[in-house]
A protein has these predicted regions:
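Peripheral interaction segments used for macromolecular assembly
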Residues: 1-178
Length: 178
């Protein structure tokens, strides 16, 4: 199935032991053209906190019921690192997130599962980041889908149109069409 991003906004995210919340938006990698995270608005059970979940944990979206199951527990999600989804997501935050969930690395600087091994520890990643000198802390290839829907597309000879939606392959979470 190839659902649109807009059709999945509002889907219920279902953990193994109950509902987590609703899909707020997605983050994608503009080099690999894959979904890297879903932003879940948790509602009352976690004080309205928004959390990031990788497609590594996704099941298949069920369009009839508007649900997306994930292979996580509510307790695991509640203990996840607090990331402000209104600000750029920093590489260090991604390292901490992947370490918490024990997910393989996905996207950025490689774009596929396992392209870059997860550091042995968060401390190791911190010291490596500090010693590498000044560099950009956020990932310039990570974008919110809400940010790009509506973008105008231009060719060398004029305007083509605008981004209405993104169509994804729900097996590998690659963006297939815009």
């Amino acid at each position: 199935m190839q659902p649109t991003i807009s059709s999945m906004v509002g889907y219920t995210i279902r953990a193994t032991d109950g509902d987590l919340g609703k899909v707020d938006q997605f983050y994608f990698d503009d080099e690999a053209w894959t979904i890297r995270y879903v932003v879940v608005k948790t509602g009352n059970w976690l004080s309205g906190r928004k959390v990031l979940i990788s497609p590594v944990a996704f099941g298949t979206p069920e369009s009839a019921s508007g649900t997306l199951s994930v292979k996580l527990t509510r307790a695991k999600v509640a203990g996840s690192p607090d990331i402000d989804t209104q600000r750029p997501i920093y590489r260090q935050q991604e390292v901490e997130l992947h370490a918490h969930y024990q997910w393989p690395w996905r996207g950025g600087y490689g774009g596929t599962f396992g392209a870059i091994p997860l550091p042995l520890s968060v401390d190791e990643a911190s010291s490596e980041h500090e010693s590498s000198g000044p560099e950009r802390r956020d990932d310039p290839h990570l974008h919110a889908t809400r940010e790009v829907i509506g973008y105008h597309i231009h060719a060398t000879d004029g305007k083509i149109g605008h981004v209405e939606d993104l169509i994804v392959d729900d097996e590998n979470w690659a963006i297939r069409f815009i």
